[in-house]
Structure formats: C-alpha cells, structure tokens
Amino acid sequence: MLGCTCCEHVTRLLLIAILMPLWATFPAQGQGGPQVTSPTKPPPNPYHYRKTIYPWHRDITATIFWIGEKPGGRNKTSNHHSSWDGKWAVNYGGYDDPNPEARANFAPKSFRPQLNSFYVALPYNDCLNHRLHRPEASRVIPWFSRYNPKPGRSVCKGRWIQLYYQRKVCYAQWEDCGPWVTDDWKYVFGGHPPRSRQAGIDVSPAVRDYLGLKSGDKLHWRFVEFGGVPRGPWSWYGSNNPFVNPEADPDVAVIRQLRQYLEQKKLEEFRRKQSPTPR
C-alpha cells in the first residue's frame, strides 16, 4: 500500500510539472495561484458546417470583369482596387489581361498570379468604409456568427462560389462587390432576383474561359463551403487561396479557438480534481 501511494504521488507531481507552464499563461487571482478562465460559450465547430448546402440563384446574367480594368463604357469604376483591397492589381501581380491570346492555363502569360485567378463580384459589401459592418450583415449573412469579426472586417471576401453553365461546373472566390450596386442583400442572401436588371454577377476571365461563356449569358450560382470544393484550375494560384495557403481558410482560426477552448476546459477539470475536497 505504501509503494502504491508513493507511485500515485510521483505521478501527480509529474502531471503538475508538465501542466504548470500551461497554467502560467492564464491570469492569476489573489493568493490562490493561477486561475484558468474559459469563454462562457464554446466557439462554433467549423466541422459542423462542412456539408452546409446553400440554395441556387438561377438564370443570373453574368458579365466579365478583370483586375486592372480601366473605367469605360458602362463601367464607371477602376478595377485596380476592389471594395476590400486597395491594392488589388498590385497584390494580384499585374493586369489580368482578358485577351484569350494573352492567356494560358487560366492566367495571363506574362506573370503568375499571386491571387486566385478564379474570382467573382457580387452586389453586396458587408462593410462600410472598412470601419464597421452594415446593420443587417450579422442577420442576413449565414456564416457571420461563426467568425464574430472585428468591426469593418469582411466575412464575405474570399468566400467560395459554385457556378453552373451548360453542364459545366466551376468554382471561384468572391473578391469584389458589384455589378452596379453593393447593398443588394435580398438577392445575394435571399430569394429575390437581382435589383439590377443588367447583371447579377461579374466573373473573371478564368471563369469565362473555363465555362466557355460570354458576357450577357445566364448561369446558376450558389455559395459553397471550402470543404466542398474539389481541386481544379481554381486551386492553382494565389496566397488568398486555401488550396495554396491553408491559412487563407477562415475556419483555420476558428478551429484554433475551439482547440484552445477545449484545452482550457481540460485544464479546469484537472485543477478541480487536484483541489483538496473540503471536509
């Protein structure tokens, strides 16, 4: 019995020695040593959303746009910058030349894109002046609460879109806002038709070339979780692309938060068991 008690005592000391550095990362309170504190509510589990199915937006008129496009004709806005990136063309690496003769492998021949060449614009911006979110954003964006973003930080930028045109399926990332309006949440997240009758989605030259469509054609599109995106040409390029840079997936940060929460709960349970029981 004495030997067994000694072994238990040694095991307890070893566990305390291993976990003490972890306790030191939490704030101390009074004379009682470090206190482990946890959020009152666990962070959402991203794995629960991996198979989320979003509704289709059908027969939506698409137009072609590209990074570096100058204002002209109906287009009154320069595409050297996007609604979320003031240096869009610079960060992309140059001009996303739409001329088919100047393109190969769904990208310009003159340089390798530093961002995903498969991108789209939808007529909604969840942020106002990069400082705060639109009043309805937290209510209408299905994944908003998953990320609990800081004011002015977009939860729409980089989201994946599935597109369908004449029996071909393509995937792209949402990287700009438009065409024509940037507040049409009833269409983007609801069942309403686009407020603009001219177009409801802009697609990049890479999307155009993969699907074989031209400006003015109608397609179907819907949101899709990154876990449901297969590999393809849309997985080849870009630091904003989770296929290339896993840290670009916003769920990575949420998974970290969830793991930290679970670790804290385990530490709390361990400390509770180690505390002497009052007699």
Regions found by a protein language model. Give the residues of each.
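Bacterial N-terminal signal peptides
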Residues: 13-24
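N-terminal secretory signal peptides that target proteins for export/translocation
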Residues: 1-10
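Secreted/periplasmic proteins
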Residues: 30-278
